[in-house]
UniProtKB/Swiss-Prot annotation:
Residues 35-78, 150-199 are annotated as: Disordered. GO terms for biological process: regulation of DNA-templated transcription; regulation of myeloid cell differentiation. The lineage of its organism: Eukaryota, Metazoa, Chordata, Craniata, Vertebrata. This is Transcription factor MafB. Pfam families: bZIP_Maf, Maf_N. Residues 157-168 have a biased composition (Basic residues). PROSITE patterns: BZIP (PS50217). SUPFAM superfamilies: A DNA-binding domain in eukaryotic transcription factors (SSF47454), Leucine zipper domain (SSF57959). It comes from the Eukaryota. Residues 54-76, 169-194 have a biased composition (Low complexity). The keyword DNA-binding applies.
Amino acid sequence: MAGELSIGAELPTSPLAMEYVNDFDLMKFDVKKEPLGRNDRSGRHCTRLQPAGSVSSTPISTPCSSVPSSPSFSPTEQKTHLEDLYWMANSYQQMNPEALNLTPEDAVEALIGSHQVSQQLQGFESFRAHHHHHHHHQHHHHQYPAVTHEDLAGSGHPHHHHHHHHHASPTPSTSSSSSQQLQTSHQQHPPSSSVEDRFSDDQLVSMSVRELNRHLRGFTKDEVIRLKQKRRTLKNRGYAQSCRYKRVQQKHHLENEKTQLIQQVEQLKQEVTRLARERDAYKLKCEKLASNGFREAGSTSDNPSSPEFFM
């Protein structure tokens, strides 16, 4: 009964320790009865071996009740070395080191050093409670950033003077750092007007899309969209101007060609008129020659002195 009371007194209430103990399956070990004369000694040993308790539906079992007894704990001290080796092999088989990834030496050291593990767990729980208390005060200070150091000092918490002073100071420094970041961002990214003025119209029109994207790295999306819209407007304006210029050039070319054709037509008309006059002249001349020929033929036929007349 005294051993059970001592076990209950040394059980930690930490959930982490409870979860640590629940990972071990203690129901697969056999129960070995110990002599009555060694109950007190084995009870004290069990209090050292069990680091934490577990509240579960399984019956409470201790490592001492499931692990075979050590040769030093047996009632008769006349155990041979062969029996010692048998106890070590039997305990190694029952503890299932494959599941725990332990060697026989690690299993013995784990059973012996379990009391130190419980002390470390208790120290961790105390550190965890202190950290939670510090985090609670820090969260409380961030909820009320306008409270000054003098107000906190006068509120009746002098033992947290250093913590509140340490957390109250970052408020102006945070604002100053944010303002410096904004100034740096403004220096790195000038306003939209300066971004548009950074490139001339000729540069925007003559620059390729890949080169423009390389120059626009680091600017905001709105500035990039605005600059690309300006470039598209300039491109469309250039296209319209080039088309208008081409149309004007084509119009001038057609007008010149028309003038030349009109001149050629006039020249051809004049040539036709000249040829018509020449034709008429040649026609009159031909008619004259024809009439003269008929007259000469008639005069020769009426002459009696012709040699044919006397024949």
